[in-house]
């Protein structure tokens, strides 16, 4: 096992959209969990605009709040399967902007989780 994938770590995985952590890093996250690390996922957005075209195509079209609810349920289910904790900062997407207030939120997140 490589030094990177070892137990007793506290890891934060940042994800732009709700499903990115699974499709981009799911295997690594699973290996970290299997090795005994604790992983917390931080999604910047629900991917409600650019990552949800199939949801927007439904008839009748769902509201933005409904799209976010669906995406939240999907990310919670994926997190439960992986055995991680998760939160969504709901920064919105398209564009996803990180200004001073949001940077402060991220600093607080690091202080809280101590990765």
What are these regions (language model features)?
Residues 1-113:
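Active-site rim/loop-helix segments in enzyme catalytic domains that contact anionic ligands
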């Amino acid at each position: 096992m490589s030094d990177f994938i070892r137990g007793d770590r506290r890891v934060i995985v940042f994800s732009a959209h709700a499903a990115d952590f699974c499709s981009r890093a799911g295997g690594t996250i699973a290996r970290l969990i299997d090795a005994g690390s604790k992983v917390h996922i931080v999604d910047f957005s629900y991917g409600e605009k650019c990552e949800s075209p199939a949801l927007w195509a439904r008839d009748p079209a769902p509201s933005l709040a409904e799209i976010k609810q669906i995406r939240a349920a999907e990310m919670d289910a994926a997190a439960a399967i992986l055995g991680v904790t998760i939160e969504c900062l709901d920064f919105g997407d398209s564009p996803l902007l990180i200004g001073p207030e949001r940077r402060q939120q991220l600093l607080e997140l690091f202080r809280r989780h101590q990765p």
